[in-house]
Amino acid sequence: MTRIVVLDGSLRPSAGNTARALSLCTSSFDASTEVDRIAVAAYRGSVGEMASRLCAADGLLVGTGTYWGSWGSPLQQFLELMTPYEATEVFFGKPASVLVTMDSTAGSEVASRLAATLVCLGCWTPPFGWMALSRAGVALAERAPEAARDVWSHADLPVLAHNLVVAARIPRAAFQAWTVERATPIDSPWPAAHSLPPAAPDFL
């Protein structure tokens, strides 16, 4: 069984566009793929428990909305708390794909920066391993499919899902890590993150 941890780093983890996009993506996983889904804004475990769940994963799927050109604050908090696990078995050598939602702009930049951040933690990105779904792009695909052939849409989610699972099933290569200034992990309760009520236009 291939285990994928799905992290929802958005501010509306229960009912937002990112939550729906992640659900659409994971619906393409085959029966041999087990999903451990974590809504970071609603997570109430400990830092150590979070690290253990990531450590048990064969791959990661990380989702977030776009907030003023960046990812959600719950995801930023996650990255800060997980920094002591940089280049450890929690992240090292694991494929990580990124799925970003946005209204109309900045999502591609957020996705590329997030993928690069995960690489610095020790992960690697599969082919076609990150994408940004926009309200504008989805609307275009619905109204003028020919004009939207080169714009990310729902139809691209199975590719992202397939490539992540294929990458997660590749035998772990003998990668090497450079030296990092390692912080000491703190196994404390996960700090409560704030979330937002539904407000952004739904498009998924």
Regions found by a protein language model. Give the residues of each.
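N-terminal beta1-alpha1-beta2 submodule of the flavodoxin-like/Rossmannoid cofactor-binding fold
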Residues: 1-87, 144-204
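Short, glycine-/small-residue-rich phosphate/pyrophosphate-handling segment
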Residues: 92-140, 152
